[in-house]
């Protein structure tokens, strides 16, 4: 729905001012009900009077017919006032609520918008929470990629370790196989050597066996030769083993150098891999920090953009307000241009106030007479205003009487409440004394014995004498009894005390409300008294215009009321101001000459009322017409006479004409001077 509809409805309901309208309607409804009751009572009394009038004799009916007619007229006036008041209330309400739109769709749409606003607030809070959470977990993708990289690198390292381990195992097995093969070759060589030696020894042994038969002489030499040959064979074996071991050592040294070179190369590659892994870890950490910083930067950018948008909206609203203020200023300037004659109207109003409150009756009569010459409808407007003021005065009188009755009723109710409060205070004091009696009883007995003794004594005492009313209500024993039932009596006493306190608080609240209503009624009565004095001043002001025209038909009640208000009005006037005005008028009149005083008295007589003013006006018009006709007649006659006579007669006629005009001008000048002096 468009905002213009809301603004239009807001303006209309603001102009209607529903709270004040409800307050006024409450007061108006109360007044209508009062008038209804008064009209019912008056109609009942009128019905009884008519019944009595019907039962009278014809002669008595003629005597009392004016009275019954006046009562009917009064009842008709009351009914017309009641209908006018009801119509006024109805028209006021209609004027305020005629253009007011139906608030149901507006309230429904506003409720829907409020629900949407609440949902949007919750969603905004959720979005902000998720954005904060997302900013905290901005390195999720980097962590995920790092995890994948770590998994891949761990798989690669595991594969590398497996390959290295397999290579190591293969190399160890190859080395062992090679060693075993070399050992086997060495052993085979040794075996072949041993076999050759064995064969050589067997050949030698066979030779020796063949030669044994040749003689035992050569036995020692042969033994020596055998020993030498065995030693030579052993030496050859040792040398062969030494050669093989040296070759094996040389091969092992060469293999050791190759393995040390491979080990150095492998250690350098591992260091490079560790450095690379550390650099990758640092790089991943920097990437995660970068992601967090970029997320925080993005969040800050969004918050700053949101703040910028809010500031732009505030700036636009301020610009719109400034534009509205400028338009209002332009309208005010136009109004000021339209009200450029304010000072003039203010001067006229001050003059009217002076006429109303601070000028003599003669001066005000002169001003009003001059205004009557310019505007003949002024008197009719004053008469209508007088009627309206009289109607409002009657309404205020009825209101004041009703409020006096209400004030008397409130006084009576306040007195009754005071009496009730006094009785309640006495009852409360009595209850407190009874409570003190209950609390002061000495608890020397146990519960069972005290209860039994209390019950027996209470029964005995009831046979002998009566209990007090308070004791009979709350169950307090007399002075001679013990408080055995204290544990059961105290809750009852406390409950009754609470009831008395709540009742006392309610009565105090009612008393405060009565005092506040009494103060409000006193303020309203003082306001009504001020309004009545102002209305009396206006009536005095309006009666100064038609004192000589309007007939005096006032009842004794109205005379008494007006005498009361006249006394208040006379007391409110400042005596020094009246004395100063009278002295000023006396001083002005004293400075005048006898001829001016004669002219002023003549002007006062002429301008005294409407009849004298009209007579003087017709007299002036007739005199001027007569002079004009005589001059025309003399001019026409002069043409038929001789030249000398015509000249003489024309001179005489002109002198007569000048004399008549001079007299009229003197009278007008005298009236003007008197009017200026009075001003």
UniProtKB/Swiss-Prot annotation:
Keywords: Coiled coil, Golgi apparatus, Membrane, Phosphoprotein, Transmembrane, Transmembrane helix, Transport. Residues 14-90, 178-341, 385-444, 492-540 form a coiled coil. GO terms for molecular function: SNARE binding. The chain crosses the membrane at residues 615-635. GO terms for cellular component: Golgi membrane. It is a single-pass type IV membrane protein. It is found in: Golgi apparatus membrane. InterPro entries: CASP_C. The keyword Chloroplast does not apply. Its main location: Golgi. Residues 636-679 are lumenal. The modification Phosphoserine is found at residues 364, 450, 453, 555. Residues 1-614 are cytoplasmic. May be involved in intra-Golgi transport. Present with 2650 molecules/cell in log phase SD medium. This is Protein CASP. It comes from Saccharomyces cerevisiae (strain ATCC 204508 / S288c). The gene is COY1.
């Amino acid at each position: 729905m468009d905002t213009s509809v809301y603004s239009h409805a807001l303006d209309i309901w603001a102009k209607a001012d529903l709270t004040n309208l409800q307050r006024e309607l409450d007061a108006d409804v109360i007044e209508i009900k009062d008038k209804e009751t008064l009209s019912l009572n008056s109609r009942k009394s009128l019905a009884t009077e008519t019944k009595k009038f019907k039962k009278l004799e014809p002669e008595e009916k003629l005597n009392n017919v004016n009275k019954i007619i006046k009562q009917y007229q009064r009842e008709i006036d009351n009914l017309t006032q009641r209908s006018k008041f009801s119509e006024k209330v109805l028209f006021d309400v209609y004027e305020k609520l005629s253009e007011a739109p139906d608030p149901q769709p507006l309230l429904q749409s506003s409720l829907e918008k409020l629900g949407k606003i609440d949902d949007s607030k919750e969603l905004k809070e959720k979005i902000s929470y998720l954005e904060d959470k997302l900013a905290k977990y901005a390195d999720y993708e980097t962590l995920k990629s790092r995890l994948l990289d770590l998994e891949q690198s761990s798989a690669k390292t595991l594969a590398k370790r497996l390959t290295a381990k397999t290579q190591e195992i293969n190399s160890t097995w190859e080395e062992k196989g090679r060693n075993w093969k070399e050992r086997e070759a060495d052993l085979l060589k040794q075996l072949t050597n041993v076999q050759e030696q064995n064969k050589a020894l067997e050949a030698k042994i066979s030779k020796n066996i063949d030669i044994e038969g040749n003689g035992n002489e050569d036995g020692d030499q042969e033994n020596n030769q055998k020993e030498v040959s065995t030693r030579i064979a052993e030496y050859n074996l040792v040398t062969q083993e030494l050669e093989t071991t040296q070759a094996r050592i040389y091969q092992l040294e060469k293999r050791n150098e190759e393995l040390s070179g491979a080990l150095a190369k492998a250690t350098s590659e591992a260091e490079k891999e560790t450095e690379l892994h550390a650099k990758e870890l640092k790089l991943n950490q920097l990437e995660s920090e970068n992601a967090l910083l970029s997320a925080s930067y993005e969040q800050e950018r969004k918050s700053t953009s949101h703040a910028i948008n809010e500031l732009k909206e505030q700036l636009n609203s301020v610009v719109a307000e400034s534009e509205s203020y400028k338009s209002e200023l332009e309208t005010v300037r136009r109004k000021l241009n339209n009200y450029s004659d304010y000072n003039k109207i203010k001067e006229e109003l001050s003059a009217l106030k002076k006429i109303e409150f601070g000028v003599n009756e003669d001066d005000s009569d002169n001003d009003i007479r001059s205004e009557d010459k310019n505007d003949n409808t002024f008197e009719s407007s004053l008469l209508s205003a007088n009627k309206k003021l009289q109607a409002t005065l009657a309404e205020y009188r009825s209101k004041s009487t009703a409020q006096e009755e209400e004030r008397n009723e409130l006084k009576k109710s306040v007195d009754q409440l005071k009496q009730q409060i006094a009785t309640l205070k006495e009852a409360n004091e009595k209850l407190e004394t009874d409570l003190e009696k209950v609390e002061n009883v000495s608890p020397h007995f146990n519960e069972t014995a005290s209860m039994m003794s209390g019950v027996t004594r209470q029964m005995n005492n009831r046979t002998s004498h009566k209990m007090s009313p308070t004791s009979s209500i709350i169950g307090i024993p007399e002075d001679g009894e013990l408080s055995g039932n204290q544990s059961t009596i105290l809750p009852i006493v406390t409950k009754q005390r609470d009831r008395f306190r709540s009742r006392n608080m309610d009565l105090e609240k009612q008393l405060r409300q009565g005092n506040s209503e009494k103060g409000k009624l006193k303020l309203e009565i003082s306001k009504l008294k001020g309004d009545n004095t102002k209305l009396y001043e206006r009536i005095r002001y309006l009666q100064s215009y038609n004192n000589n025209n309007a007939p005096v038909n006032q009842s004794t009640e109205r005379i008494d009321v007006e005498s009361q208000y006249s006394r208040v009005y006379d007391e409110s006037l400042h005596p020094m101001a009246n004395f100063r005005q009278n002295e000023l008028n006396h001083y002005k009149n004293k400075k005048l000459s006898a001829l001016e005083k004669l002219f002023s008295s003549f002007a006062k007589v002429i301008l005294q009322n409407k009849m004298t003013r009209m007579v003087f006006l017709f007299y002036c018009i007739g005199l001027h017409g007569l002079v004009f006709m005589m001059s025309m007649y003399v001019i026409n006659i002069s043409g038929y006479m001789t030249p000398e006579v015509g000249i003489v007669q024309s001179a005489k006629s002109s002198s007569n004409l000048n004399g008549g005009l001079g007299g009229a001008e003197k009278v007008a000048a005298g009236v003007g001077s008197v009017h200026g002096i009075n001003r």
